[in-house]
Swiss-Prot record:
One of its GO terms (biological process) is L-leucine biosynthetic process. PROSITE patterns: IDH_IMDH. This is Isocitrate/homoisocitrate dehydrogenase. Pathway: Amino-acid biosynthesis; L-lysine biosynthesis via AAA pathway; L-alpha-aminoadipate from 2-oxoglutarate: step 4/5. Mg(2+) binds at D194, D218, D222. Its EC number is 1.1.1.286. Coiled coil: none annotated. One of its GO terms (molecular function) is 3-isopropylmalate dehydrogenase activity. Keywords: Magnesium, Manganese, Metal-binding, NAD, Oxidoreductase. NADH binds at T69, T70, T71, N165, G251, S252, A253, P254, D255, N263. It comes from Pyrococcus horikoshii (strain ATCC 700860 / DSM 12428 / JCM 9974 / NBRC 100139 / OT-3). It catalyses: D-threo-isocitrate + NAD(+) = 2-oxoglutarate + CO2 + NADH; (2R,3S)-homoisocitrate + NAD(+) = 2-oxoadipate + CO2 + NADH.
């Protein structure tokens, strides 16, 4: 029996995670879920986004399923829950899969998750604020190995997106990435981040495995969601040496919280990635979601009228219709990403 920590978070987080748990339970009985509080509501009660005793219990889990968190501009001393978890658990690799189920294609982005401009380090006084863009050898080497192995296992190339023509930190990062790729005989295409955004919009399907720094990767993956139909269907995994956290990449969307119209697909696919990481099989969920999306009856963010409950029930119905081994060839590599990444970590 696998132990999975559940942090539903704020806004629509509880709604989409409840949906994901229902779907997981429809395909396996080998997971026990343990719920922990976290997010802005916890900060308002305890002064921290997650309590230390809860964090210690979470470290003992096999994986984490995370919803969404609100990070307001105007709450003094509040630190983002997800950034706190990434730092505390050293979740250094962020894998984002942007699927287009109608085309049966995907964009895969590997984002360095612990350093760069999101390192949370800097200095300020009343006249100046500085955020440090930190790239360390350790951080660059481990994310490069992660992305290069993923590219090699999928028999594709690596697209390294940077700003090395301007930033010294990216020159350092670039050298390490190229050295590791050369040793593993993986081809690297280099792209300057500015011009790459145009390629990502116009011709996204021949980019191999995309690797970039923390902030660049965050922005690029959000931009890429235009090819998915909605940010609400995009899953992600945050991988460390000892544990991994899975979350939809969308925010807490407080404007629609409680209305029953949040898109649960990103959370459901994140749970599928979690199953693969645990050595179970998330492929049936990918297949069922693909069939459901192609049939239609989607939530308002995808120009539909369906509720969260209707989408969840529809996906579970598709699961029950599927033969366990009925998997589209085009998705075979993708649905086993978690296993590949488990070997890396």
């Amino acid at each position: 029996m696998y132990k999975v920590a559940v942090i539903k978070g704020d806004g629509i987080g509880p709604e989409v995670i409840d949906a994901a748990i229902r779907v997981v339970k429809s395909v396996t009985d080998k997971i026990k879920f343990y719920e922990f509080e976290g997010g802005l509501s916890v900060f308002k009660k305890y002064g921290v986004p997650i309590r230390e005793e809860d964090l210690e219990e979470i470290r003992k889990m096999d994986a984490i399923l995370f919803g969404a968190t609100t990070t307001p501009f105007d709450v003094p001393r509040y630190k983002s829950l997800i950034i706190t978890l990434r730092k505390e658990l050293d979740l250094y690799a962020n894998l984002r899969i942007i699927p287009n189920f109608k085309l049966r294609k995907e964009i895969i982005i590997v984002r360095e998750n612990s350093e760069g401009l999101y390192s949370g380090e800097g200095a300020y006084d009343s006249n100046k604020v500085v955020d440090f863009r930190i790239i360390t050898r350790k951080g660059a080497e481990r994310i490069a190995k992660f992305a290069v192995k993923l590219a090699k296992d999928r028999s594709t190339f690596l697209t390294f997106v940077h700003k090395a023509n301007i930033l010294e930190s990216d020159r350092f990062f670039r050298k390490i990435v190229l050295d590791i790729a050369r040793k593993e005989d993986v081809k690297v295409r280099e792209e300057i981040v500015d011009s790459f955004t145009i390629k990502l919009v116009k011709d996204p399907w021949n980019l191999g495995i995309i690797l970039s720094e923390n902030m660049f990767g965050d922005i690029l993956s959000d931009l890429a969601t235009i090819h998915a139909g909605s940010i609400g269907i995009v899953p992600s995994g945050n991988y460390g040496e000892d544990i991994a956290l899975f979350e939809p990449i969308h925010g807490s969307a407080p404007d629609i919280a409680g209305k029953g119209i949040a898109n649960p697909i990103g959370a459901i696919l994140s749970a599928a990635m979690m199953l693969d990481y645990l050595g179970l099989d998330g492929s049936i969920i990918w297949k069922a979601v693909g069939r459901y999306v192609r049939r239609g009856n989607l939530t308002p963010d995808m120009e539909g009228r369906a509720t969260t409950l209707e989408v969840t029930n529809g996906i579970i119905s598709e699961i029950y219709r599927l033969d366990e081994y009925e998997i589209d060839e085009v998705w075979r590599d993708e649905v086993r990403l978690g296993r590949i990444l488990l070997e890396i970590s």
